[in-house]
Amino acid sequence: MNDAFDLRLAPAAVHGIVARLRELGFRSWLVGGGVRDALRGVPPADWDVATDARPDDLLRAFPKAAPTGLKHGTVTVVDDGKHYEVTTLRGESAYSDGRHPDAVRFVDDITADLARRDFTVNALAVDPSTGAVIDPFGGKCDLQARVLRAVGAPRERFAEDGLRVLRAARFVATLEFELDPATAAAIAPTLDTFRKVSPERVRDEWLKTMKARSPSRAFEVMRATGMLAVTCPEILEGVGMAQNRWHAFDVWRHGMACMDRCAGDPVLRVAALLHDVGKPRTREFSAKTKDWTFYDHDKVGAAMAEPICERLRFSTDERRRIVDLVRHHLFHYDGWTDAAVRRWIRRVGRDRIEDLWTLNEADVRGKAAAVDEADMSPLRRMKEHVARVLAAGDALSVRDLAVDGSDLMRELGLPPGKGIGVLLGELLERVTEEPARNEPAALLAIARQIVAARGMD
């Protein structure tokens, strides 16, 4: 790793910010994840600037900047749709609430500012005039060794801000680093501070973690250090719980493998994490098969996933998606008729099908370190069958029927009410079995038969 930083890596907007501050007589440094990522050869997602200019000076220097964190000395400069945080140098302060400093103390020394940061690899700065890397805590060595180490005394850092322990777990996954033993050992003693972190922040860290190639690295840290016992103890019920002969892993390790193999967005990966959460509460030994069974673990798991998602403040849409996928992650393939496939589509919802394909493939591949490709054949056949049924364009909801409630009331003389919806549901069932019946005359004839048989009026 070179001693000098290649300043050409920083975008023109960052150089413009630095030039404006220099023009007004202020010093500035490139800091944060942008420096860290550039030094390890990864294109930075964002760039931050630290400066000895005070907040009022920043507003004068950048009158169009958003005062996103002015209390803490931060403004956000927007250039060509991209956001750049510019922050006044700050020193250390007490953290009584376990999340925020009691008072903000602005300083002029970049080393003092870096000393308050969480990990050595994030406590690096670059002088934009020379490209010199300022590294008072050995962050460059830790980057080379791929080690995540707290700045200074780990227990002090974690006692200041409870979110830092969760960030440690995330960085282990997203950076693919190993956690320094002393840093890891400091997590459990500071869990009382971690308990002060809001559920929303925990959720956000989970979703950021899910962008890693192997998010299981983070969740293993959370398990080993006690964080998961605080945020989601239900998942821990699967640790060490053996499964049936088709699984090489216990419930916990299978969940980790499924999550890693689930090549979807972060919310889908949360569903993968929780898909078998109901197994420990449904496990029974079968005298007939001489093996473990987990009957209804999908339903039990969905009932467990709902309060977990509520507790972590997932949005309504995210919660519904996760719970639906846990509830419907089990399905069968061969031997299904077209009618059975249509019922399955109605049950799971057309908008969940692609998610279920991704989740099911990850579920199968997560049964062992290596899975025979023949094990994927049932899923491929199911996908082909569903594609054929969808291509046929047959009715899959009441809206697809050739008659509606108004037609039934007009042609059969029925009053409005819940009975109309029930009758439409009956017609959909008939059409599910025989799609050719989905035409007005046939449906009205069937409706008359149902009304006559049940005495509806």
Task: Go through each PLM region and give its residues.
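Catalytic cores of the polymerase beta-like nucleotidyltransferase superfamily
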Residues: M1-D457
